[in-house]
């Protein structure tokens, strides 16, 4: 099937919660801004949001995302955090129950992944920092309070996978 969302440059890892998929649209990095698309796979309907979903995950009927918006015009990144509740598709700024983590995340040099453990409910966010330095993975509890920061030597922490 082909579904035309009207959004440019669908890019990145998608996350799924039940019948819903969260997809990032990077835009053109010049004049077309990034977007977030949530697709209902049961009926092919979708909703487009005016913020990026570059790094996203699903947990307890919500999509949590850190958006990364790059501009070739200014050569800068802008980061944002949003949550989309399911099935209402209501979007809000910040990371809902994890809002206490927002300040730490927005102060990261280069947020690069987000994951919430289905077992503990702890949220993990990586800071790649740069492509030439060691990165960090931050662990937050269910209220968004930082528990630990793990140094990853020689690794750019771009994906978090539960094993």
What is the meaning of each model-derived region?
Residues 40-44, 85-90, 140-145:
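Short loop/turn segments that connect beta-strands within beta-propeller blades
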Residues 30-38, 72-84, 132-138:
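Structural motif
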Residues 20-23, 64-66, 121-126:
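Conserved beta-propeller blade signature
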Residues 1-5, 46-54, 90-106, 147-154:
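Beta-propeller fold detector
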Residues 5-16, 50-62, 106-115, 154-163:
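Repeated scaffold domains used in trafficking and secretory/extracellular systems
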Residues 102-144:
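C-terminal structured domain segments
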Residues 24-28, 66-71, 76, 128-130:
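Short loop/turn segments immediately following the C-termini of beta-strands
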Residues 1-30:
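Solenoidal tandem-repeat scaffolds enriched in leucines and small polar residues
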């Amino acid at each position: 099937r082909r579904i035309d969302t009207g959004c440019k440059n669908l890019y990145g890892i998608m996350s799924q919660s039940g019948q819903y998929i969260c997809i990032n649209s990077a835009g053109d990095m010049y004049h077309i801004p990034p977007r977030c698309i949530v697709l209902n796979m049961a009926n092919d309907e979708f909703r487009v949001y005016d913020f990026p979903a570059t790094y996203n995950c699903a947990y307890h009927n919500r999509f949590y995302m850190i958006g990364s918006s790059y501009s070739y015009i200014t050569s800068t990144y802008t980061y944002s955090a949003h949550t989309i509740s399911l099935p209402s598709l209501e979007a809000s700024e910040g990371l809902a129950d994890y809002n206490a983590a927002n300040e730490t995340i927005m102060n990261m040099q280069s947020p690069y992944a987000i994951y919430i453990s289905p077992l503990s409910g702890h949220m993990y966010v990586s800071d790649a920092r740069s492509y030439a330095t060691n990165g960090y993975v931050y662990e937050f509890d269910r209220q968004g309070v930082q528990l630990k920061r793990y140094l990853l030597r020689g690794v750019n922490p771009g994906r978090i996978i539960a094993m």
